[in-house]
Amino acid sequence: MNKLENPLQNDVAGPAPRHRTTQVMVGDIAVGGGAPIVVQSMTNTDTADIDGTIKQVAALARAGSEMVRITVDREEAAAAVPHIRDGLRKLGLTTPLIGDFHYIGHKLLAEYPACAEALDKYRINPGNVGFKAKRDTQFADIVEIAIKNNKAVRIGANWGSLDQELLTKLMDENAASAQPRDVRAVTREAMVQSALLSAARAEEIGLPKTKMVLSAKVSAVQDLIAVYQDLASRSDYAIHLGLTEAGMGSKGIVASSAALGILLQQGIGDTIRISLTPEPGGDRTLEVQVAQELLQTMGFRTFVPLVAACPGCGRTTSTTFQELARSIQDFIRVEMPSWKTRYPGVENLNVAVMGCIVNGPGESKHANIGISLPGTGESPAAPVFVDGEKFRTLRGENIAGDFKALVIDYIEQRYGAAPKPGAAQMVPAAE
């Protein structure tokens, strides 16, 4: 049997080195060039609804989105953009705003200069920026406005709106070839060429690489991986990752995580968006949470303390550990906005909530603080471990409440400037 080769040729588990890209500043956020991978999201409000859009951008930003894209599809939306920016500033939010333009972006940016100034980045789709003779002119118009306003641009190809003239040309060339390629391979090549040719044209007009981000989105996982591998191998532009039309619920989460996870592991990607179709009335911020969890799970960034919990089995017929894990997870999410300033570094905390004696003590020892709750037929006692050492054993009807109090004490003492007066010290209790 052949031994699987480790491409890193050492004992360190981790991703491949990051693909070297040119850094782009979007507002005050650095994208590419070795900067931390950026989480972004997009609103689904009518941008002309100023109050509604401010509310959703604020929710996305507070959930952790570091950039937010908004649709600018008509005059009313373009006119609303400066007011949205100003409303966010009044809330103390400086999250960069990205304008998503299709078909008439050149017209809106020219006729609404306040919109062009208020946005931090313009997204151009080379497949619908213009058609025939108008395409190059309208593309140039947007690029020149970006240069004038010192704004970044994302050139985002999408196979749902691919440049048909370019695709037809490549398909005809392929049909005439002695060894024709698969149609999907030709489509992928058209995606990559669309992005790269547009970027080259933007540079000719005067937009530097330090102002450009590229993307090439498809909705099929394997095609997406192939497209981005090709794009990265042929350029050093900053890269935006995303699986378009990923879908709803678990399907969308799994598809996006599978595709982006593979690319990130290969060192590809400078900013990501998880494009989820929300349930009717669902929480738009879920896409931000999933993006953060993907990056944190893979070890690229830390956003919130991690809560490890066992999946449960026949040994854990009690729901106590499940309820406690959920309670701790929800508690952390609610408290993180204030914890970020009060307890620097708290995002690195690891908590374990385990359901029985099999893996409970061992997993708890690997966490900063962990608890092993009793499984079916086990003694009604729950040992707590702090930094790998047994700390105390909780008993009685309020194990969940007692453990949460210990978590709070641990955070205050490890990450606070000084323990709160009267706060319980992390001193092992006599058993």
Swiss-Prot record:
Q: What keywords would UniProt list here?
A: 4Fe-4S, Iron, Iron-sulfur, Isoprene biosynthesis, Metal-binding, Oxidoreductase
Q: What class of enzyme is it?
A: oxidoreductase
Q: Where does this protein act, in terms of pathway?
A: Isoprenoid biosynthesis; isopentenyl diphosphate biosynthesis via DXP pathway; isopentenyl diphosphate from 1-deoxy-D-xylulose 5-phosphate: step 5/6
Q: What is this protein called?
A: 4-hydroxy-3-methylbut-2-en-1-yl diphosphate synthase (flavodoxin)
Q: What's its job?
A: Converts 2C-methyl-D-erythritol 2,4-cyclodiphosphate (ME-2,4cPP) into 1-hydroxy-2-methyl-2-(E)-butenyl 4-diphosphate.
Q: Which reaction does it catalyse?
A: (2E)-4-hydroxy-3-methylbut-2-enyl diphosphate + oxidized [flavodoxin] + H2O + 2 H(+) = 2-C-methyl-D-erythritol 2,4-cyclic diphosphate + reduced [flavodoxin]
Matching InterPro entries: Dihydropteroate_synth-like_sf, IspG_bac, IspG_bac-typ, NO2/SO3_Rdtase_4Fe4S_sf
Instruction: Provide the GO MF annotations for this entry.
Output: 4 iron, 4 sulfur cluster binding; 4-hydroxy-3-methylbut-2-en-1-yl diphosphate synthase activity (ferredoxin); 4-hydroxy-3-methylbut-2-enyl-diphosphate synthase activity (flavodoxin); iron ion binding
Cofactor binding note: Binds 1 [4Fe-4S] cluster.
Sites binding [4Fe-4S] cluster sit at: C310, C313, C356, E363
Q: Name one GO biological process term.
A: isopentenyl diphosphate biosynthetic process, methylerythritol 4-phosphate pathway
Q: Which Gene3D superfamilies match?
A: Dihydropteroate synthase-like, Sulfite Reductase Hemoprotein, domain 1
Q: What family classification does the UniProt entry report for this protein?
A: Belongs to the IspG family.
